[in-house]
């Protein structure tokens, strides 16, 4: 059983566990976007990273866990929108890849 644990923040990470052992940890793939070059989750790179690491597994033997997070005091509306967008990209990629 492969467990993929995801910390969805821009400074987050993706961890791959198998049989109680950490197999790999990668930083959240990001890219600069917009006039201000704000960092966002790079969905294309995340798809590639996940695809590469799960290719030898049967989809039924994979579970994905995404950290459930909420707003923190003092965070502005824009920050929360950006975070929600990153969260949505991650969930969308997992859904498109049919990862449970």
Regions inferred by a protein language model and the residue ranges of each:
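Phosphate- and other anionic-substrate recognition elements at nucleic-acid/protein interfaces
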Residues: 1-100
């Amino acid at each position: 059983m492969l467990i993929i644990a995801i910390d969805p923040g821009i400074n987050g990470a993706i961890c791959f566990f198998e049989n109680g052992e950490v197999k790999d940890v990668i930083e959240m793939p990001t890219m600069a976007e917009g006039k201000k070059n704000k960092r966002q989750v790079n969905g294309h790179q995340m798809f590639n990273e996940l695809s590469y690491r799960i290719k030898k597994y049967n989809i039924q033997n994979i579970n994905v866990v995404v950290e459930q997070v909420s707003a923190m005091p003092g965070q502005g509306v824009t920050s929360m929108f950006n975070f929600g967008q990153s969260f949505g990209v991650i969930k969308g990629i997992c859904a498109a890849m049919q990862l449970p």
